[in-house]
């Protein structure tokens, strides 16, 4: 998780990631330094969630972070879920760096307003496309109606006794 401020966009990004079933192996805030980028590379995450700035707010930090990620050796998808005003520019920067990009709505469009669902859904899609295949879970697709990350499965399990969860309706 890469974000601007530890208690704001980084926290929102962690909520999105954890709610989608991702394992957060690290987080960094403010402008990415070379040392922090090396730590991300060493952690070898399945994906990076790039967040920061409210919509129309600070753009310098997230653009700097996009440039740092673009120039890195990281070879995993990057989910961009930050300042909407510069989302296109971030994707362009990352694309020029040869990165696979997934775009989602800002996890914190306004200070104090969490909007993690779009990022959570992109992370879940990546989980389904990549992680399940890499871990051999794709073999279950014909045997069960849907494969869910553990946190989502637990939430669905809680919903079932009170009227049926989303997975039960599929």
Model region roles, listed by residue range:
Residues 1-168:
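Nucleotide/phosphate-binding catalytic cleft detector across ATP-hydrolyzing
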């Amino acid at each position: 998780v890469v974000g601007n401020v530890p208690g704001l966009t980084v926290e929102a990004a962690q909520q999105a990631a954890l709610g989608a079933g991702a394992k957060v192996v690290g987080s960094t805030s403010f402008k990415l330094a070379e040392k922090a980028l090396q730590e991300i590379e060493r952690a070898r995450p399945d994906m990076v969630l790039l967040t920061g700035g409210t919509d129309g707010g600070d753009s310098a930090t997230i653009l700097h972070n996009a440039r740092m990620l673009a120039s890195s050796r990281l070879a995993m998808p990057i989910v961009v879920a930050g300042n909407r005003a510069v989302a296109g520019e971030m994707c362009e920067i990352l694309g020029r760096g040869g990165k696979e990009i997934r775009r989602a709505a800002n996890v914190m469009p306004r200070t104090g307003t969490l909007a993690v669902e779009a990022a959570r859904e992109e992370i879940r899609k990546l989980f389904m496309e990549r992680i399940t295949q890499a871990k051999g879970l794709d073999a279950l697709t014909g045997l069960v109606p849907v494969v869910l990350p553990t946190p989502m499965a637990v939430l669905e399990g809680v919903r079932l006794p009170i009227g049926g969860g989303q997975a039960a309706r599929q």
